[in-house]
């Protein structure tokens, strides 16, 4: 029964997880939170991760009831993500693997989300909507690859929401997306915003530029409230995501949809996806914030699958890749 330790730190979340044969034994996590109206810089984020990662490692082992001798493999996020945070975590993973004399595995962050979603929900072969601060992709499995059927052609949906939160000076604690979601529940007026879908691809830079341009004027003149803008932005960008997911499901003949990534925690997105799936006679699968937000257990789970399939990452190849495509990885652990 192999036990895999996973390190995740591709953005402002740092997590260490332990997975053994499909069971999550530990999954502690910390978040680097910045003041309202600001984002997080790579260097500052990396310094935060370095300051807490060893405490998280000890916390994970204690929670799992394991020692270093019980761990069979060390997995870490190879990419995609922000360079400095990725490097800070990869250095610790390499060091731990050498100190404990354990094999090392570099894991694709996106595949970590997918494998954790499959594990937690029991979805067998879903069309995946992967939505986060750094990625927006519609994915389906075929011939040992997670194939990207559609994606953003500019910025990720989570990045769009985060940057809008800065315009309104919305708090980053616990996350700007969560706070937008709560404000949107009180919105009553739908403001017409640009809607850009091109086949199975989407674009969010136009809607962000538009709402950045008009937000302060509309608020100053009383045309709408901040809550109305949050509501309108959510409804518009989520409708775009539902459309391209449904198109991919129709193309693949899929009867399952799985939402993964930090934006996947949004209840309104889940409701809209559920409506679409019901109309197609399909099933929707989603996880809660423990597993849809970046976490160490998802890297451990993907690492576990790779470890069982015989994958290993030599030290000479254990760097990071900021632009690590989902479809670059050969998925040898699935039929």
Curated annotation (Swiss-Prot):
InterPro entries attached to this UniProt entry: ATPase_NBD (IPR043129), Gcp-like_dom (IPR000905), KAE1/TsaD (IPR017861), Kae1_archaea_euk (IPR034680), Peptidase_M22_CS (IPR017860)
Amino-acid positions noted as binding substrate in the UniProt annotation, renumbered to this chain: 130-134, 162, 177, 181, 266
Single Gene Ontology BP annotation: tRNA threonylcarbamoyladenosine modification
One term under GO cellular component: nucleus
Cofactor details (free text): Binds 1 divalent metal cation per subunit.
Binding site for a divalent metal cation: 109, 113, 130, 294
Record key words, sorted: Acyltransferase, Cytoplasm, Metal-binding, Nucleus, Transferase, tRNA processing
Positions in coiled-coil regions: none
SUPFAM superfamilies tied to this protein: Actin-like ATPase domain
Principal cellular location given in the protein's record: cytoplasm
GO molecular function (one): metal ion binding
Catalysed conversion reaction: L-threonylcarbamoyladenylate + adenosine(37) in tRNA = N(6)-L-threonylcarbamoyladenosine(37) in tRNA + AMP + H(+)
Pfam families: TsaD
Alphabetical list of CDD domains matching this protein: ASKHA_NBD_OSGEP_like_euk
Cofactors, names only: a divalent metal cation
Cell location: Cytoplasm; Nucleus
EC number of this enzyme: 2.3.1.234
Family stated for the protein in its record: Belongs to the KAE1 / TsaD family.
PANTHER family registered for this protein in UniProt: TRNA N6-ADENOSINE THREONYLCARBAMOYLTRANSFERASE (PTHR11735:SF14)
Function: Component of the EKC/KEOPS complex that is required for the formation of a threonylcarbamoyl group on adenosine at position 37 (t(6)A37) in tRNAs that read codons beginning with adenine. The complex is probably involved in the transfer of the threonylcarbamoyl moiety of threonylcarbamoyl-AMP (TC-AMP) to the N6 group of A37. OSGEP likely plays a direct catalytic role in this reaction, but requires other protein(s) of the complex to fulfill this activity.
Subunit structure: Component of the EKC/KEOPS complex composed of at least GON7, TP53RK, TPRKB, OSGEP and LAGE3; the whole complex dimerizes.
Name by which UniProt lists this protein: tRNA N6-adenosine threonylcarbamoyltransferase
């Amino acid at each position: 029964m192999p036990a895999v330790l996973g390190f995740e730190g591709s953005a402002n979340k740092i997590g260490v997880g332990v997975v053994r044969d499909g069971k999550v034994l530990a999954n502690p996590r910390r978040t680097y939170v910045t003041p309202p109206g600001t984002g997080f810089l790579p260097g500052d984020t990396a310094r935060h991760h370095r300051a807490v990662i060893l405490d998280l490692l000890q916390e994970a082992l204690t929670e799992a009831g394991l020692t270093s001798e019980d761990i069979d493999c060390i997995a870490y996020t190879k990419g995609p993500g922000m360079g400095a945070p990725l490097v800070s975590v990869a250095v610790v993973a390499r060091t731990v693997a050498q100190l404990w004399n354990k094999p090392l595995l570099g894991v694709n962050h996106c595949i970590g989300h997918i494998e954790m979603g499959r594990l937690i929900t029991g979805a067998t072969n879903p069309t995946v909507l992967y939505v986060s601060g750094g990625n927006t992709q519609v994915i389906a499995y075929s011939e040992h690859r997670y194939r990207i059927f559609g994606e953003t052609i500019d910025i990720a949906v989570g990045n769009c929401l985060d940057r809008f939160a800065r315009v309104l000076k919305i708090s980053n604690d616990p996350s700007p997306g969560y706070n937008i979601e709560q404000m949107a529940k009180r919105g009553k007026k739908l403001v017409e915003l640009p809607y850009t879908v091109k086949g199975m691809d989407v674009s969010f830079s136009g809607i962000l530029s538009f709402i950045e341009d008009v937000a302060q004027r509309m608020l100053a003149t009383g045309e709408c409230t901040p809550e109305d803008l949050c509501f309108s932005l959510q409804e518009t960008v989520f409708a775009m995501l539902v459309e391209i997911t449904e198109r991919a499901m129709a193309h693949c003949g899929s009867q399952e949809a799985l939402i993964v990534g930090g934006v996947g925690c949004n209840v309104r997105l889940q409701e809209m996806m559920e409506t679409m799936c019901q109309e197609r006679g399909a099933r929707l699968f989603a996880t809660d914030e423990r597993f849809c937000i970046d976490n160490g257990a998802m890297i451990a789970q993907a690492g576990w699958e790779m470890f069982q399939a015989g994958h290993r990452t030599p030290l000479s190849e254990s760097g990071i890749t900021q632009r690590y495509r989902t479809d670059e990885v050969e998925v040898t652990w699935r039929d």
